[in-house]
Amino acid sequence: MARSLLKIHRYFRRKPVRFFSFILLYLTAGSLVFLHSGFSSDSSTAGIAGSGSDPLLSEGRGGTGGGSATSEGLGLLGRVFKETRRTPRRFGPPWMKESRGQDAPEWAGRGFDHTSSWSHGAKGRTTKEMDDGRAKYIGCYVDDTQKRALRGVSFLDYKKMTVFRCQDNCAERGYLYAGLEFGAECYCGHKIQAPNVSESECNMECKGEKSNLCGGPNRLSIYRLELSQESARRYGSAIFKGCFRRPDNVTLALPASAVMQNMSVDKCVDMCTEKEFSLAALAGDKCHCGFPTPLFNLHEHEDEELCLHRCTGEDFESCGNRDFFVVYQTQVQDNRCMDRRFLPTRSKHLMALASFPGAGNTWARHLIELATGYYTGSYYFDGSLYNKGFKGERDHWRSGRTICIKTHESGKKEIETFDASILMIRNPYKALMAEFNRKYGGHIGFASQAHWRGKEWPEFVKNYAPWWASHTLDWLKYGKKVQVVHFEDLKRDLFSQLKGMVIFLGLEVSEDRLLCVEGQKDGNFKRSGLRKLEYDPYTVEMRATIDRLIKTVDMELRKRNLSGVPDEYRPR
């Protein structure tokens, strides 16, 4: 045996080329053996898929198909080869992954070739519902960088993009559609201007949410948004204000104007934005720009049908006419009410802005600061509010440098400290939910579903609902001079309610400043209108308790010759 090996060794030393040729032949033969085993196991997997079960989808659902069993005996090379030969994975939106029941389409569970079904007419058939009260999945669409499918605003986030974040941003701006692309890009628009394609082409995971898909390369996963009433009044970056009669003196009321060919909302809004005006008024083929003033205060709305005249540049838009203007608010900031400062001389009188938590105190402070030009203070200190512009937050509440002091206190001693107070009251059903969201999600955030369905919510209602009533009753009883302001009335008629608050604070009213506030009323202190609870969190017992408390407060208000609680939350 040793002699034979020695002879072979000497032979290959004399002829090394033959040695390397032999080694190469040996490796080739070994590779073919491995490849053959890969083909065999892959064909068995294909047989399983043909019987109505996609092994990849089965794994995703926790199924026990034969695909995994056949792969156990494969070496590394065999497994890699098998993966490369598989039918391309069919990615789909969440509704496809979840719905495999009776209502699922026939192709949802088998090896269906999506590319063979593309057509413009397929759009209606491929529309799948992800209907959670916020949005409905429409499909996968082509997107061209030169000619976008959705032509509104867009934003990118290559770390934290999610489906909800994109939907929320588009909804807040009043767009009807939200589309995601490349896993990280969000596009908004009022109409889809591209054909739909195979669902398999929208196959990229969201950067901030691996469980969802966010389009693909030059492919948009598009959702139709169910807008809140306020969001529905938006048009992209502009806010629809309504239909208004032509002002008596257009030149004074709206100082900039131009005749535009192929008029559209975008063209007029863009022109007024460029000229730095906060209002864009469309009058047929003419575009007017200006600010809200006593000459054109936007308080007397006309029937919107009077403005239903098609734009020459966009058939589905209304551009008004010579007598009735369609008005939009642009993104230009009206600076007439943005200057704020501390009181020039320290006040000896302490004015409270009192409310139950969740009754809109932060929002009311924002409005008061804009309307008066003076900072508001706080009985507490909240660093997050200071960082958002409430500079009076750091002052001691007795400093006398702020126009009023935020407080949620309700004890006799604390109330009698103040010389006068504005008492904010809000529907307890809304206030309790707002405070619960604040407690578990921040000033403009949301509590999670786990908090709502867990022990926290019932315990919260049990402790806080009686406080809602006792807080109001204590301020009515111990307050030296109290002006009641209902959150709902302030929201419904901001101009007159805020005017009354400014007068109560002992300041001169600036109508221009109040009109400016109307255009900036939300500030950064409003929760998104898109995320809604999908169920009523109040039990029958909770409602019975809260209704009794509402009646108690209503009776006390009427005893003092006040209007009582607003109709929307008085028990019926």
Curated annotation (Swiss-Prot):
Residues 134-226, 237-331 form the WSC domain. Residues 1-18 are cytoplasmic. InterPro entries: P-loop_NTPase (IPR027417), Sialate-O-sulfotransferase (IPR051589), Sulfotransferase_dom (IPR000863), WSC_carb-bd (IPR002889). Residues 40-572 are extracellular. It is a single-pass type II membrane protein. The keyword Lyase does not apply. Glycans are attached at residues 196, 249, 262, 561. GO terms for cellular component: Golgi membrane. It comes from the Eukaryota. Belongs to the WSCD family. This is Sialate:O-sulfotransferase 2.
